[in-house]
Amino acid sequence: MPESANRLALLIGAPHRGEAAMHGDVQAFYDALIARGLSSDDLLVLEGRLDRELVLSFLATVQSQVSVWDRGDVFLYTSGHGAYAPMDAIDANTVEPALVFGQGDLDDPSRWVFWREVFGTLALPAKVRLALLPDC
């Protein structure tokens, strides 16, 4: 992430029951970003048994923080599961990708956060750059 007066890294790890890899992914990114010069104040971590409402609330809180920035950088890393709707689509141009949170049926869209919702909730100011790395 380029040097900026305003910078923030968001690390989201969303394992399903019995999975530990997502925690390791988030910890590895946290350690790497600290080693690259970010302070712990520049890092926000959300991980564990997450659900749709918690993730959207987290993103809304971030939005309220960065909405006053005239410029800056936000890095968003997610480690978890993904899906797309409709699940039976045969054309990549007709699908909508999503992140899957919570326990239970991965095919339940009520547990999904669509990427359009992520970007809409963050609603970054025009001169705030977003770097995105989804691992799902």
Question: What are the language-model segments listed below?
Answer:
Residues 15-20, 44-48, 105:
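Second-shell loop/turn segments in exported
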Residues 8-12, 44, 131-133:
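Hydrophobic/aromatic beta-strand patches that form the interior of the parallel beta-sheet core
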Residues 30-72:
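Functional beta-strand-loop-alpha-helix junction segments that form "active/interaction loops"
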Residues 12-16, 48, 79, 135:
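Cofactor-binding loop segments of dinucleotide-utilizing enzymes, especially the Rossmann-like FAD-
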Residues 6, 56-79, 83-136:
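Caspase-like (clan CD) cysteine peptidase catalytic core
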Residues 15-31:
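Glycine- and acidic-residue-enriched helix-capping/strand-helix junction motifs
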Residues 2-18:
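Short glycine-rich His-centered loop
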Residues 19-22, 52, 111:
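Solvent-exposed, acidic/flexible segments
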